[in-house]
Design a protein with these regions (language model features):
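Interfacial segments of multi-pass membrane proteins
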Residues: 45-48, 71-74, 92, 111-143, ...
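Cytosolic, membrane-interface loops and tails of multi-pass inner-membrane proteins
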Residues: 20-53, 107, 189-215
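Loop-to-transmembrane alpha-helix initiation sites
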Residues: 126-131, 145-153, 165-178
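Short, non-helical or kinked segments that cap or interrupt transmembrane helices
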Residues: 29-40, 101-115, 143-153
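Multi-pass membrane catalytic core of lipid/isoprenoid biosynthesis enzymes
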Residues: 46-72
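Helix-coil boundary and interhelical linker segments in multi-pass alpha-helical membrane proteins
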Residues: 1-6, 66-88, 119-126, 161-173
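N-terminal signal-anchor transmembrane alpha helix
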Residues: 2-27
Length: 215
């Protein structure tokens, strides 16, 4: 029962669209009318530069970190917690962000929240592996497909977790998280791309699209 409660709480924590809220509060803009309509940190950057992106990133990271600590708390309270229950609790905030009910289940790609969760459950090596891989690709191969970049980031993260000899439950949490991220990448590059194309602008266009569906 307690495990189910933590899974539900973590899903709700992840579903809070902080980047969208930051855009509305600090600049009065809907960041989902920019770029690929993703309600995440990258479109906050497109909509208002670092003034929006920095607080959005901090808050999105923080919700993942808090959820990750709650998942770890399950083990502290009951070391016999089933591996699958812990893994679901760790992946729940990522799913919450990707399928948030506050935005009609059209959430973001969950990169920042994933970073927060894995920093909480695996420490700074995991954070540096994931964030470092994404940043390095942006610097060296910025035009690479997003799906490739995030997939490589997750592969490096999983490799570091394996090198750290983390318990098997981490592999399950990693697989669940990776599955959510891949689904979101597929949606934004195929399903949601159809919406973008109707307004005559590419998925990487920074201009707001009049008539597009906001959050």
């Amino acid at each position: 029962m307690k495990a189910a409660l933590i899974v539900a709480v973590n899903f709700l924590l992840g579903s809070v669209p902080w980047a969208v809220m930051v855009g509305r509060v600090l600049r009065g803009v809907d960041i989902t009318i920019y770029g690929d309509h993703n309600p995440g940190t990258y479109n906050a950057l497109r909509a208002g530069g670092l003034r929006l992106a920095a607080p959005a990133m901090i808050l999105e990271f923080a919700k993942g970190f808090v959820a990750g600590r709650l998942a770890q708390g399950m083990l502290t309270a009951n070391p016999a917690t089933a591996s699958w229950a812990w893994a679901v609790a760790a992946a729940a905030p990522v799913a919450g962000h990707g399928f948030t009910p506050f935005l009609r289940f059209r959430g973001g790609k969950a990169l920042a929240v994933t970073l927060g969760v894995w920093t909480a459950v695996a420490g700074w090596p995991a954070m540096l592996a994931y964030a470092g891989t994404l940043c390095l690709q942006e610097l060296t191969w910025p035009k690479a497909p997003d799906a490739f970049k995030v997939s490589l980031g997750m592969v490096v993260l999983g490799s570091v977790a394996w090198l750290m000899r983390l318990p098997a439950r981490y592999a399950l949490a990693w697989a669940l998280t990776f599955a959510v991220i891949l689904i979101k990448q597929w949606q934004y590059e195929t399903v949601f791309q159809c919406t973008t194309d109707r307004y005559g602008a590419g998925i990487n266009d920074n201009r707001p699209r009049t008539g597009s569906r906001g959050a």
